[in-house]
Amino acid sequence: MKNKILNTVLISILLLVVVFFVSTNFIINVQWFKEVGYLNVFFTKLIAICKLFVPIFILYFCVIAIYLFTLRKSIRSLVGDTKFKSVKKYFLLSNLVISILGAGATATTQWYKILQFTNAVPFGEVDPIFNKDISFYVFKLPLVQSLFSTAISLIIILVLITVIIYLALGFKDKIYQNKDNVININSKTYGIRKFAGKQLAVLASVLSLLIGCSYLLKSYNLVYSTRGVSYGAGYTDVKITMIFYKVIAVACVISSIVVFISILKLKFRPIIISIASIAVLIVLEPVVAIFTQQFVVKPNEMELEKPYISYSIDATKKAFNIDEIEVKEMEPNENITSEKLEDNKDIIENLKVNSTGPLLSFYQQVQLIKNYYEFNDADTDRYNINGKYTQVFVSPREINRDSMTTWQNKHLRYTHGYGLAMSRVNSVTEFGQPDFVMKDIPTVNTTDINLENPRIYFGESDNDYVIVNTEGGEFDYPTGDTENTFNYNGTGGLKMTPFNRVLFSIYERNPKILMSSSITSESRIILNRNIVKRVQEIAPFLTYDSDPYIVVHDGRLVWMMDAYTSTDKYPFSEPHEGVNYIRNSVKVVIDAFNGNVDFYVTDENDPIINCYLKIYKGLFKPLSEMPEDLKEHFRYPQDLFELQSKVLTKYHVDDPIKLFTEEDLWDRSLEVVKHGGENLSQGDEVKEESILNKAKENKNNEAENEGLYLMTKLPDEENVEMMLLDYFNMRGKQSMVALLGARMDGDNYGELVMYKFPPQRTIYSPILFKNRIQQDPNISKEISLWAGKGSEVIYGDIIIVPIEDSLLYLNTIYLKANSENSMPEMKRVILSNGDKIVIEENIEKALLKLFNYNSSEENKNSNKDETPKTEITSDKSGVKEAADLFNKAIEAQKNGDWATYGEFINKLGDVLNKISQE
């Protein structure tokens, strides 16, 4: 007796342990979603599945039970009354298993579609073929088609159940065939018809009806057809395929009646004829469609397909939100006057002279401070710095967890990043280095931007958990040879109660969490610190931008991220990158210290986000609740902009004839990614940093030019603003035909503006401008000299900005010594307008040489990239001598007198050494 009780207790404990191990993930999810304030979002899915599971289970169970009930007489006659009761138990158990599995599979795969169906929001637009609101295709049709597939699967399951029972009883007959009281199911007088003829007749009829209905539903999929010259239903789809689908549906209805009657009457010929008729129709449809396409449509394709091409143009433009672009014609004037520059001096003052690649490389060398920090990316934003609207690069300093070797360092000690580096986009120092306005640890801040808490517990590279408020404290930042510590006082993380220590030890498969003496009951474990993973855990149904960026807000750091609603079910809209409808409907804000996540709706007219608002109550906030200073940092997302640019290469036209003839197709402008050195004296490679490894190179080492965030001013506008610009060429040619800009400041946010250039003129595109740089004898000599002396030459971003009715071209050149720890420095600026091109040390000198425009004298607040003459505090005569030698060396270089150039450079080195020793 005691052993029995002991065994029961041990088994119970074992079961509890197993349940605990299995449910650890669920328990942690509940705690984590409660911490971030979205527990209702977590339970939305679970509640939906549970609500669906019960009725679906009842439906499955009842259908199968009723069907088995109709077979009871046949089964009873075969097994006898005595064994029938035991057989019923097996059938009941089998029904339970099948119903549970079927209901579970249906509920877990269809819950989201059902919620979308029941919370559908109309688009207010209809497709041109069936006159259905777009919401029918996006929210309703997927569920209806899935339910029909499920119903067909259920019919097949019932047929299989019938066959299995029939065969099982047949196997039993072979075992007991010597017993006279058992009916032989395999006898000629007793077959499957007598066993389940009526049931199979009903199933066959229902299956035929379902197939017919599925063809009616299939006709709606023609709005996604790729058969014609444009996406969506074409002439053949509407005039041939759609009619065939209707005929097949009618034939299936007739066949269902024929099959039912014929099975009951044992007449198989009508069944064969009806099934064969449907098969012939199914086979005949593509044959007739191909014939019609080749011999009717092809000879008259333009006329017959024209209305359907128009449908595709209209739908694609609406779906990708490019139907309201403000298009302006521009015929660039090749002569920018100094008066025009003076009128647009705010454009000149904000010209982008820094590029992300070299800048990030410099940050990594100078601003890491310690090797356990890293800069993942440098993002572009704008701030009012000391009263001036300024575009800046911002890069947060995060912990490099790859450099951590011990568990304590990785999870207890080095828990957070610290501060950021911020530098101006439009200026460099006298040495060509970034012009910092925030830098170092502790933060050296030369702006009026308030940053009181620079700590980063949540970032782009934080993929591991950390435990804060431990006995030893957390490393905060270095001061000389000492380390400052910090104890986390935020709201993020889960309390490390004894229960949670056991729970996370099991979850992380690491007993150190349980055994460490540094962890107390006041300690907290912070999970999902990677901001992308964090928001995906909360709202996986949104698509997130690939480039989150950090913002200084209210004395602390927060991340901003763009989120998209999208679908591939928009009728007649041609898909790009897996979607054919997209909206930037949500801005996500993540607190870098506490981990709080807020989702703000920015597009209240988007039906998909309005559907989500009904499904996930409490998840989204109206834009009116966002702090106003955060709205000032809205960026038009680059991922969306580049997707829209790709769509525009084909769908910038309104005329269906132009789309059909492909006479006006565009390409996004190309840029040289690597240049192998035919202009270089020693074959040294000139590297390109403007592509950032995102675009795929072609065989000529060319890739699509990326859109760039620039501070500029559009023609006819009064103020500079941050914009995203992209450039287009005529397909197969390199001459630029259009410039696209996305506005993002204030009330102009989201507006797209396009300037079209006359196609008969040659307008320099980025790649033509780059080729021109490399072919210019003066520029190529200078670059060849640097490369020949062992320096690495790096081209910056190519900038093309409109100045009233003209275009100004800008490129910068960086030099980097061929050593492991060298830093790129911006040494030259190339400016061009029309046929003129110059290379100089800075913007001011280039403007003076190209346009005779002296911005330094006429503009008191000129760009900082002009070399200051007051920052060298040594002997003034020495400085003047050095400047004279440098100017003479450059003059000799321009004249091709390399011997004289070398002499002046040697003398310059001696003078600089002398100054440095004084």
From Swiss-Prot:
Membrane-spanning intervals of the chain: 8-28, 46-66, 91-111, 151-171, 200-220, 243-263, 271-291
Localization: Cell membrane
Keyword Transmembrane: yes
Keywords recorded for this protein, A-Z: Cell membrane, Membrane, Transmembrane, Transmembrane helix
Stretches for region Disordered: 856-876
Bilayer topology annotation: Multi-pass membrane protein
Claim: Mitochondrion is one of the keywords in the record: no
UniProt-listed Pfam families: UPF0182 (PF03699)
GO CC, one annotated term: plasma membrane
Composition-biased stretches (Basic and acidic residues): 857-876
Family of this protein: Belongs to the UPF0182 family.
HAMAP family noted in UniProt: UPF0182
Protein name: UPF0182 protein CPE0011
Protein source organism: Clostridium perfringens (strain 13 / Type A)
